Every structure is written in structure tokens, then in C-alpha cells.
């Protein structure tokens, strides 16, 4: 509803206005996803694994609702090729366990924007290319000193090589031409923890973590967790935790063109959480579980991407953010008859995220306001009805009003209305001699809801998908 049309009388006086209904024909996509997993168990406590994922994506990016141009006169396309591969080894003994992983990730991503020069000849305005190579390794270990005391330790390392450029733009640094950015960074993370259960009802754990990003080290990051069974009947358990948090800017945060900000500071803060959980049930009849928790988080130098006066998004630090709220969750599994099963899962969250920092200028109206694009309320509900190899799945979600500006002004472009979303899926499974086969049909946006997740980018109305899943035996 960004394009308003005027209706004039014979004297060219506006007598009425309306928003025309338009169709966005620039949002097609083709995706190919392949996953292969292979495991070998020696039967002597060792398991070896190989996992590989491949993604080939080619999609158009739909026009903004504020774009009044002819959709046939431009091309706005993003392509991606990604390969993720992991080798793993798990070694298990009576009172200790060791696991290792090594992997490689390659991503090639292209963004092209072309515009018709007027004679049908498409001119490239943007030719963005990114290549990301990541090597990583991980080692985790567990050791039971006694039945009541468990020690764990872990170490992970990532080496990123990122080259990103726009072939239509060349910048100069000194006397050297630089196209985009070409950066490498090592990231290390190490953790040690001790988990102690002195009595059957009480459990406590302490975690110490330290991280390195490039040349920057975090201080030692502690966390403490405790849980206590208030009642064995219903398995009612109280839980609480306090955690120190750090987050370093990503390479995109620092160097993305256009918009990267090399002056970003790392986030830091504390999170406090407390809650209750329960679980009841009857064998082969039903199980019911649920939890409710309160959290309070104070973050200094929160990193957020916001539009700037130059017309594109750029990350910046918010001096202090106070995020708090309540989160609830419930699960029900019910056997209705011999071959009939019903599963229900629901969540609800109230999560204010308030800017409590310092004004950036005399005109700054963001203090005391909700952060942009963060809903204060959200909820989900899903239900699965199964009969033998058939299943019917219904998903529902709700997101409250979100603001697009730090001032939280409720103008036409200053907020996104709340919306409800429903999806339904029917699935049939087949067991063949050589593979398990699944056929699945999905109706997304069942009630054809009009909604936005990002300003000026309308989401699809009712749409349909069909999936074929093959799992070799």
C-alpha cells in the first residue's frame, strides 16, 4: 500500500484516492538441496561419520512496494552454491567420552541487478560476488569422576577466508585498487564445565568459556546453572541461571559493502533466568510437559543494522539495551487409538527489548522505545495427527506489531501490523526395499493473509509446495 493513486475531476481537483492492487511477478526461485550421511559403528565404542550438504539456489528478489518501475525492465537476482562437509569420530568408554569433528564449508554467492537501458539491452548496475571458505575443527570430552560429578571440556577453531566484491565498483586505498574486501580471521572458543548432583533432587553446574576473534580475546566468560526437583509427582522442577555474554562483530558487520562499520564494538552483558517445568504421563496413553521462564538481559553496545541517510543499511552500536520477558512452552503427545496419534506443541513469548542507552543527537527519539523489527508478543501452535504412515500437520503463528523506526512512530511506513499465519501439510510415507520414501504437500498461508516481515517487501499470499523425500537404507 505504498502507491497511492489520485482521482481528479474536470478541473484537476483531487476528489478521491485509492491504493491499486498490484501483482509482484519478480519472486520466482529454484532450489536444490542434497544431504548425504554415512556412519560406521565398530561395535567397540567407536563411531565414524561423514556428512555432506549441498545447496544450489537461484532466486529473484521481489520488487519493493515503493518501486513504481516496470518489473519487466529490470532483473534483481541472487544465486548461491554452498557445500558443507563434516568428518566425525566419537569414542565412548564406561566413564568417559571423546568426540572430534573436522569440516570444510564453501559458499559462492552472487547478486546481480540489471536495468533496461531503453532498447531491450540490460545493463549491469550491480555485480556482487562473494566467496567464503571456512575450515574448522572441534574436540569435546566428558569424564565422570563419580556418579555425581561430571567434567566436560571443548575446543573449537574456525578459519574464515572471505572475499566480497562488486565488479562494477573499484575503490582506492592509497595507490592500490581494492574491489570489495578480502579478509581472513581465526576464531577460537574453549569451554570447561563441572556438573555436580550432590543429592537426587539438586543439580548445579559451572561453565567457563573464552573466545578469540582475530587478535581480540574475550575475558573469561562464566555461567552458573542450578535446578531443583520440587516434587517428584509431576516432575516439577525449578531452574535458574546467570550468564555473562560476549559477541564480537562478524566480518559482514565490519566490512560488508556498502554499509560495513569497522568501528563497531563487541557486545557484552549479563543474562538472568529462572523458571519452572513439569512432565506427567501414562505409558502408551499420553505425555504432557511444559515450562515457563522469566529472563532479564542487559546488553552493552548491542549491534543492530539500521537504514542510514545514504539509503542503505549499516550496523551500529546501541549503548545499552534491556531485554526481558516471559517465555512458555507446552507439549502433548496422545495415543487416540491403536494406530492414531496426536501431538501438539505450543509456545508464547512476551519479550520487550528497550533502548536504554544515550541519545545520538538532540533529535534522537529512540530512548525507552522497542528495538526495530522485534515483536513484543509472539506465539506458535502446531498439531500433528498421524495414522499409520499418514500424517496431517497444522502450524499457526502470531507476531505482534513491529516498528521499523527507532522512534516507534505509527506512521504508514513506521510500523508493520500484527499478523496470523496458518500452514497445513499432508504427508504419506512409503517403506521400500532400498529406501524410505515420503511424499508431502503443503499449503502455506492457508487463509491468504496479507503481511510484511520487512518494510515494503510483501510476503506471498496462499502458495503451494510439494516435496519428495528419499532416505536410502
Where are these regions (language model features)?
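Transmembrane beta-strands of outer-membrane beta-barrel pores
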Residues: 1, 54-58, 93, 104-110, ...
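Outer-membrane beta-barrel transmembrane domain signature of Gram-negative proteins
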Residues: 77-86, 91-92, 104, 112-205, ...
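Flexible loop and strand-edge segments within Gram-negative outer membrane beta-barrel domains
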Residues: 2-10, 21-33, 39-98, 106-132
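Outer-membrane beta-barrel channels and translocator barrels
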Residues: 41-45, 92-96, 144-148, 197-203, ...
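Gram-negative outer-membrane beta-barrel transporters
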Residues: 197-201, 293-298, 317-406
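Membrane-embedded beta-barrel scaffold of Gram-negative outer-membrane proteins
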Residues: 95-113, 231, 237-239, 266-324, ...
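Structural signature of Gram-negative outer-membrane beta-barrels, strongest in the C-terminal barrel
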Residues: 146-152, 156-162, 172-297
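C-terminal beta-signal and adjacent terminal beta-strands/loops
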Residues: 2-4, 300, 344, 398-407, ...
Amino acid at each position: 500500500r505504498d502507491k497511492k493513486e489520485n482521482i481528479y475531476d474536470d478541473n484537476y481537483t483531487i476528489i478521491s484516492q485509492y491504493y491499486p492492487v498490484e501483482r509482484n511477478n519478480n519472486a520466482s526461485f529454484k532450489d536444490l538441496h542434497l544431504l548425504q550421511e554415512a556412519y560406521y559403528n565398530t561395535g567397540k565404542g567407536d563411531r565414524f561419520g561423514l556428512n555432506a550438504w549441498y545447496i544450489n539456489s537461484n532466486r529473484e528478489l521481489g520488487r519493493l512496494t515503493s518501486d513504481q518501475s516496470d518489473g519487466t525492465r529490470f532483473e534483481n537476482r541472487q544465486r548461491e552454491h554452498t557445500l558443507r562437509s563434516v568428518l566425525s569420530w566419537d569414542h565412548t568408554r564406561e566413564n568417559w567420552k571423546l568426540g572430534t569433528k573436522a569440516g570444510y564449508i564453501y559458499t559462492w554467492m552472487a547478486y546481480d541487478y540489471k536495468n533496461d537501458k531503453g532498447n531491450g539491452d540490460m545493463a549491469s548496475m550491480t555485480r556482487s560476488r562473494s566467496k567464503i571458505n571456512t575450515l574448522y575443527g572441534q574436540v569435546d570430552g566428558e569424564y565422570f569422576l563419580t556418579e555425581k560429578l561430571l567434567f566436560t571440556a571443548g575446543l573449537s577453531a574456525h578459519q574464515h577466508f572471505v572475499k566480497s566484491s562488486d565488479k562494477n565498483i573499484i575503490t582506492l586505498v592509497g595507490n592500490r585498487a581494492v574491489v570489495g574486501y578480502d579478509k581472513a580471521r581465526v576464531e577460537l572458543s574453549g569451554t570447561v564445565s563441572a556438573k555436580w548432583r550432590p543429592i537426587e533432587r539438586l543439580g548445579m553446574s559451572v561453565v567457563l568459556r573464552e573466545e578469540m576473534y582475530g587478535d581480540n580475546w574475550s575475558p573469561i566468560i562464566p555461567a552458573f546453572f542450578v535446578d531443583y526437583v520440587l516434587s517428584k509427582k509431576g516432575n516439577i522442577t525449578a531452574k535458574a541461571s546467570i550468564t555473562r555474554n560476549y559477541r564480537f562483530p562478524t566480518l559482514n558487520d565490519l566490512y560488508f559493502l556498502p554499509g560495513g562499520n569497522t568501528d563497531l564494538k563487541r557486545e557484552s552483558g549479563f543474562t538472568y533466568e529462572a523458571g519452572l517445568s513439569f512432565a506427567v504421563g501414562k505409558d502408551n496413553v499420553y505425555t504432557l510437559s511444559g515450562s515457563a521462564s522469566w529472563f532479564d538481559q542487559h546488553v552493552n553496545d548491542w549491534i543492530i543494522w539500521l537504514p542510514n541517510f545514504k539509503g542503505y543499511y549499516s550496523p551500529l552500536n546501541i549503548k545499552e539495551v534491556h531485554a526481558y520477558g516471559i517465555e512458555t512452552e507446552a507439549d502433548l503427545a496422545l495415543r487416540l487409538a491403536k494406530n492414531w496419534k496426536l501431538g501438539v506443541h505450543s509456545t508464547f513469548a512476551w519479550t520487550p527489548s528497550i533502548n536504554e542507552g544515550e541519545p545520538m543527537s538532540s533529535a534522537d527519539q529512540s530512548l525507552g522505545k522497542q528495538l526495530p523489527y522485534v515483536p513484543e508478543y509472539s506465539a506458535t501452535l502446531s498439531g500433528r495427527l498421524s495414522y499409520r504412515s499418514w500424517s496431517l500437520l497444522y502450524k499457526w503463528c502470531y507476531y505482534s506489531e513491529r516498528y521499523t523506526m527507532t522512534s516507534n512512530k505509527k506512521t504508514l511506513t513506521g510500523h508493520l501490523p500484527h499478523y496470523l499465519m496458518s500452514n497445513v501439510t499432508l504427508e504419506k510415507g512409503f517403506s521400500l526395499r532400498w529406501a524410505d520414501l515420503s511424499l508431502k504437500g503443503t499449503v502455506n498461508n492457508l487463509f491468504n493473509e496479507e503481511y510484511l516481515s520487512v518494510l515494503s517487501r510483501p510476503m506471498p499470499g496462499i502458495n503451494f509446495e510439494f516435496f519428495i523425500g528419499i532416505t536410502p537404507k
